[in-house]
Amino acid sequence: MNLFDDLPCQADEELFTELLSRRGVRIERIVSTGQSTPAGEPYNQEFDEWVLLVSGSAGLWIEGDGERELHPGDYILIPAHRSHRVTWTAKDEPTVWLAVHLP
């Protein structure tokens, strides 16, 4: 398998693919093609999430930290119960994320 297999050029929604799931740890590939999280609907998860931007670019807002622009190679830990949202993703190329969900 390859992280870049079957990347959509355009899609109505983000594509989530589970790559591995083991006792309390889940790794997934997320592919965005211009999507963002609606301003009034941030994520607030029960688990820590470590994300790596593999390709493309994106804006990520995290409660208490503000917004930051992410480029390939950038990574961040989003603590459990911290509101966050994707403010934008590249429209001209797929944005590929690697997300690791931790207890």
Where in this protein do the model-derived segments appear?
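Tight coil/turn sites that cap or link beta-strands
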Residues: 35-36, 72-73, 79-81
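A generic "binding-loop/recognition-motif" signal
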Residues: 23, 57, 66, 82, ...
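Conserved hydrophobic/aromatic beta-strand scaffold that supports enzyme active sites
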Residues: 18, 27-29, 50, 67, ...
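A short beta-strand-loop-beta hairpin characteristic of the jelly-roll/cupin
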Residues: 38, 44-45, 50-72
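A short, N-terminal "cap"/entry segment at the start of jelly-roll beta-barrel domains
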Residues: 1-42
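Residue-level recognition of conserved beta-strand positions in structured domain cores
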Residues: 29, 55, 62-64, 88, ...
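Histidine-centered divalent metal-coordination motifs
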Residues: 43-44, 84
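Ligand-binding loop in jelly-roll beta-barrel domains
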Residues: 81-103
